[in-house]
């Protein structure tokens, strides 16, 4: 994947590159090494931990490159670049998904393989609805919509109905509680194929919570 990115973007010394989904900074480091020493590598992420880790990684692995970390959502790309007084960018990189460090911290609630509170906020310090709030407050139609649109979930309506029925008895508060609801909603035959049955639902919730496609 990295080789394909480098071949497609073909960064050159002195250029300005912007990684709009910084995450673990692996792609940014590789790009920065190509544009050093006079280029500028910009990294955007909502997660304070990701920005801090990337800054430290740049100092170790790309010390000759100039790195500008910007906290925010790539949906606000124009405002972020104007606010940082960046005159122009030669190439942009978007890698939609969750970085490994985020998955490695169970309490962030991104992983369906670890039991944790349903949070999923990339910026955990931001006062925005968590996945738990989405699951327990959205009506059935809205839940169906986000599962279908953001997760391409074939059984979106069945899962949404099961969520509403379950939360009517008690709130759904943890990742494993939600996984259990999803497994019960999906036909047994479907659970045996296509990866983890909760994968698409968790993806859809993450996108909704963080407004990734706004």
PLM-predicted stretches and their roles:
Residues 1-214:
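S-adenosyl-L-methionine-dependent methyltransferase catalytic core, i.e., the SAM/SAH-binding region
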């Amino acid at each position: 994947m990295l080789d394909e990115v480098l071949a497609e973007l073909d960064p050159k010394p002195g250029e300005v590159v912007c990684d709009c989904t910084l995450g673990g900074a692996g792609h940014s480091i590789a790009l920065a090494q190509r544009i050093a020493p006079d280029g500028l590598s910009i990294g955007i992420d909502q997660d304070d931990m990701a920005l801090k880790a990337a800054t430290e990684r740049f100092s170790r692995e790309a010390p000759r490159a100039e790195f500008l970390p910007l906290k925010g959502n790539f949906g606000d790309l124009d405002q972020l670049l104007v606010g940082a007084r960046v005159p122009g960018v030669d190439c942009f990189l978007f890698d939609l998904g969750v970085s490994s460090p985020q998955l490695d911290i169970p309490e962030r609630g991104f992983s369906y393989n670890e039991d944790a509170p349903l949070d999923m906020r990339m910026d955990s310090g931001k006062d925005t609805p968590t996945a738990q709030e989405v699951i327990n407050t959205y009506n059935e139609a809205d839940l169906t919509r986000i599962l279908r649109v953001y997760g391409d979930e074939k059984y979106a309506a069945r899962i949404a109905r099961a969520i509403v029925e379950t939360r009517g008895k008690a709130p759904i508060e943890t990742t494993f509680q939600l996984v259990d609801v999803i497994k019960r909603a999906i036909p047994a035959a479907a659970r045996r194929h296509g990866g983890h049955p909760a994968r698409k639902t968790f993806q859809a919730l993450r996108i909704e919570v963080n407004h990734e496609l706004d």
